[in-house]
Regions:
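Conserved SAM/AdoMet-binding glycine-rich loop
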Residues: 199-209
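Canonical Radical SAM [4Fe-4S] cluster-binding loop centered on the CxxxCxxC motif
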Residues: 160-193
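Short, well-ordered secondary-structure micro-motifs within conserved domains or adaptor modules
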Residues: 18, 24-81
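N-terminal [4Fe-4S]-dependent radical SAM core
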Residues: 88-95, 115-163
Length: 209
């Protein structure tokens, strides 16, 4: 299985979503052969096209070009990624738990939408319908956002400040994530030295503050 994307300045979103279904599929810069297994996503002046071909069978989907973003439309990148995702979800029977999310922090999105005045129903629609996020993952993200909210509000009061502490180790990689740094299985030996240094740094910051 190969991934071929054409017609976009960047095919990152399409490539990332295809790998939710075919994790080892390489990206190719040349059109696949006629009988070659592939996912082919394309933007042309006529519209958006997505095709999957595997084991002698194939399926495809088409959509018109989206309206400009300033008129309420989606970006061509997201529209083509979404079209390809829908095709592959039907083709494989797989539903990724985080849906179409790529390179975003879901909890941060909830905070941003609430700060922008969105209703809870609008946020529900944004996650469950636009991104096809599973109910279980969305409810988890909402629970974390609800837990964080009073703490974040206190951080905006006079005489307080927020301190971001980075923990660059993950036991696994979330499907939406594009910035995981250290895999726990591979880099476990670095965890304790990192935490020891982090504790010393936090102590020093407390003394300065």
């Amino acid at each position: 299985m190969k991934i071929y994307i054409t017609g976009l300045p960047s095919g990152y979103e399409v490539e990332h979503l295809v790998r939710l279904f075919y994790p080892m599929a390489p990206l190719t810069l040349t059109p696949p052969e006629n009988a070659e297994d592939c996912v082919w996503a394309e933007k042309t002046p006529d519209g958006l096209h997505a095709l999957v071909r595997q084991d002698g069978r194939s399926a495809e989907r088409h959509a018109p070009l989206p309206a400009p973003v300033e008129q309420g439309g989606e970006t061509p990148e997201f529209s083509l990624a979404s079209l390809t995702y829908d095709l592959l979800r039907d083709w494989t029977g797989i539903r990724p738990p985080w849906g179409k999310m790529t390179g975003v922090r879901p909890v941060r999105l909830i905070h941003d939408k609430r700060a922008a005045g969105w209703t809870e129903a609008e946020i529900d629609h944004f996650f469950l319908d636009r991104f096809d996020c599973s109910q279980q993952k969305y409810q988890m993200a909402k629970a974390i956002a609800d837990l964080q909210e009073p703490i974040l509000k206190v951080g905006n009061e006079p005489g307080t400040y927020s301190l971001y502490i980075g923990i660059p180790f993950c036991p696994s990689r979330c499907s939406y994530c594009s910035f995981v740094s250290c895999n726990l299985d591979r880099d476990r030996k670095l965890v304790q030295p990192y935490v020891d240094c982090l504790c010393r740094e936090v102590e020093a910051i407390r003394e300065e503050a």
